[in-house]
Amino acid sequence: MSAQVINGKVVAKTVIDRVKQRVQLRKSQGLRAPGLAVILIGDDPASSVYVNNKKKACEEAGLVSKSWNWPSKATQYELLELIKQLNEDTSIDGILVQLPLPDHIDAETIIEAIHPDKDVDGFHPYNIGRLTVRMPTLRPCTPYGCMNLLNHYDLSVKGKHAVIVGASNIVGRPMSLELLLAGATTTVCHRFTADLQTHVSMADILVTAVGKPNFIPADWIKPGAIVVDVGINRLPDGSLTGDVDPRAREVAAYVTPVPGGVGPMTIATLLENTLKACEIHQLGAVS
C-alpha cells in the first residue's frame, strides 16, 4: 500500500488563482486591491524566507504588500506604535507580524494590539473566540489551510477520530476547533499526554505540529489513516522533513509531504484572509 500524496502546491495555486481573479474583478469595478502590511523584527533566516514567500504570493495575486524590516533591537513600544498606525490606515486590510519575535517583545501583547478585522493570521483572541462559538471570520491560516486541503481531496472528517499532536495557539488548539466544527471527534495530545502511541494509533486523521523531525514512527500510524504533517524541520544535511517518519506513506491512505504540503496552503490562506478583510472593510465603509 502506498499513500496518495496531498499536493499542497497544486491546491495552493488554485486558491491563489481564485484570489487573483477576485482582485482583478475589484479593480475592474474601480475598487482598490487589498493591502497587506508585513512586519519582520530581526534577521532570523527562516523568518526571512517565510516573509519573502508571502510577499511573492501577494505580488502573484495582485495584492499590495508593504514591508517593515526592523532590527532585533526594536522595542515593543515602537512595534505597538507602528501597529496603531496600521490599524488606522485605510489602505491596509491585513497586518502580519512574523513570529517568533525577539525575547524582549511579548507576542501575545502584539497580537492583541492588531485590530481583529485586520488580524489576517487569525491569532487574535476575538477571532479564536468566534471560531470557538462556530461563527468564524478570519481563521488561523495553517489550520484552515489544512481543512481546505482535505476538502479539495473530498476527504470528509465528519464522524472520524482526529488526533492532533501539539497544542500550540498557532496550530494545535485552533486545528482542534476546525476539526470539531467539521464534525470530527477530536483528541489533542501535548507534552503531558501519557501513552502517545496509543492515541496516535487510533487516529483516522492525524495532524502533527511538534517541530521535531520524524517524531512519530511509521508503525504508530493506523492503516488507511490521513496524515497531515505540519512540521517543517531542517536536518543536518540541510534537507527538510516533517514530524512523521516518511515511511508512514507505506501505511497511511493520504499524506501531506514536507515540503510542499501544508506550507503553501498557509500562505494561500493568508491571501484569502486579506481579501476577505478588504471586503469586510468595504462593506463597513458602505454601511
UniProtKB/Swiss-Prot annotation:
Q: Keywords assigned by UniProt?
A: Amino-acid biosynthesis, Histidine biosynthesis, Hydrolase, Methionine biosynthesis, Multifunctional enzyme, NADP, One-carbon metabolism, Oxidoreductase, Purine biosynthesis
PROSITE patterns assigned to the protein according to its UniProt record, in alphabetical order? THF_DHG_CYH_1 (PS00766), THF_DHG_CYH_2 (PS00767)
List the InterPro entries hit by this protein, alphabetically.
Answer: Aminoacid_DH-like_N_sf, NAD(P)-bd_dom_sf, THF_DH/CycHdrlase, THF_DH/CycHdrlase_cat_dom, THF_DH/CycHdrlase_CS, THF_DH/CycHdrlase_NAD-bd_dom
Name any Gene Ontology BP term: purine nucleotide biosynthetic process
Keyword rRNA-binding in annotation: no
Recorded catalytic reaction(s): these are:
(6R)-5,10-methylene-5,6,7,8-tetrahydrofolate + NADP(+) = (6R)-5,10-methenyltetrahydrofolate + NADPH; (6R)-5,10-methenyltetrahydrofolate + H2O = (6R)-10-formyltetrahydrofolate + H(+)
Q: Which GO terms describe its molecular function?
A: methenyltetrahydrofolate cyclohydrolase activity; methylenetetrahydrofolate dehydrogenase (NADP+) activity
What protein name applies here?
Bifunctional protein FolD 2
Give the species this sequence originates from.
Hydrogenovibrio crunogenus (strain DSM 25203 / XCL-2)
Q: What is the lineage of its organism?
A: Bacteria, Pseudomonadati, Pseudomonadota, Gammaproteobacteria, Thiotrichales
